[in-house]
């Protein structure tokens, strides 16, 4: 990444306030991404910063914590909220955004490789965790042969869901599998015949009415009104 005065200022101000406000939350730290060579970056002369986020805790983080801190330094902050995990990185690469905050680093790495994007991690922030939530069944003890579980359909988050199911003993992954890249092909055993339903992450909260359990990303859980304490 080409380091600029703009991104040095942004990273220092944003990271300081995020860590102060959210340091107690747990999960793999999501990456704030920036264009590796931002065409619109004019160094210290740039005064408007366009953030891209997904709905939920990421947008709230920008509005409640990062934006006030940057405005005190004389910047204008514009927030663009997306309803999916695809458009924020494409918009960043196309120059519509200066920075985005919505993803963890494995997702960023997979996405930019697949789409051949010249974007890079700027800094990391905490977020609400991925969780297994009740659907038609309300407790882990109710799992039965043929139970259905919805999960994110993007590779990195689907891998996290598989690791979660493996830890519960609902499926068994092959020995030595990389937990960051696990896929259905890495399932060695499925003793409960779990039916995994892959969906866009934004659809997972609504899917709970149709499946027995749902693996839901934290930001979409919060934006849909779910309580993180509902996770099993």
Q: Which residue ranges define each predicted feature?
A:
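Short, polar/charged alpha-helical segment
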Residues: 55-78
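Pocket-flanking alpha-helical
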Residues: 85-116, 132, 138, 223
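A conserved helix-loop-strand patch within extracytoplasmic ligand-binding domains
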Residues: 122-171
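C-terminal motif of bacterial Sec signal peptides marking the signal peptidase cleavage site
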Residues: 17-21
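Bacterial lipoprotein signal-peptidase II cleavage site
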Residues: 22-34
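Ligand-binding "clamshell"
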Residues: 110-122, 137, 210, 215, ...
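Short helix-initiation/N-cap motifs at beta->coil->alpha
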Residues: 79-90, 177-206
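Alpha-to-beta junction loops
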Residues: 93-103, 147, 170, 192-195, ...
């Amino acid at each position: 990444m080409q380091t600029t005065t703009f991104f040095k200022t942004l990273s220092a101000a944003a990271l300081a306030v995020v860590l102060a406000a959210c340091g107690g939350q747990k999960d793999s730290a999501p990456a704030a991404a920036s264009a590796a060579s931002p065409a619109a970056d004019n160094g210290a002369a740039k005064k408007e910063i366009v953030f891209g986020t997904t709905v939920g805790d990421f947008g709230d983080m920008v509005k409640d914590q990062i934006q006030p801190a940057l405005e005190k330094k004389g910047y204008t902050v514009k927030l663009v909220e997306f309803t999916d995990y695809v458009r924020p990185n494409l918009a960043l690469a196309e120059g519509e955004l200066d920075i985005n905050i919505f993803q963890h680093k494995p997702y960023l790495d997979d996405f930019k490789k697949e789409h051949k994007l010249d974007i890079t991690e700027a800094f990391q922030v905490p977020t609400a965790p991925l969780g297994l939530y009740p659907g038609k069944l309300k407790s882990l003890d109710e799992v039965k042969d043929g139970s259905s579980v919805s999960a994110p359909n993007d590779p990195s988050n689907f891998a996290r869901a598989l690791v979660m199911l493996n830890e519960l003993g609902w499926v068994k992954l092959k020995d030595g599998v990389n937990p960051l890249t696990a896929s259905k092909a890495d399932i060695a055993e499925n003793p409960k015949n779990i039916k995994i339903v892959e969906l866009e992450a934004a659809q997972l909260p609504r899917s709970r009415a149709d499946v027995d359990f749902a693996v839901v990303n934290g930001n979409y859980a919060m934006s849909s009104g779910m309580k993180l304490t509902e996770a099993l």
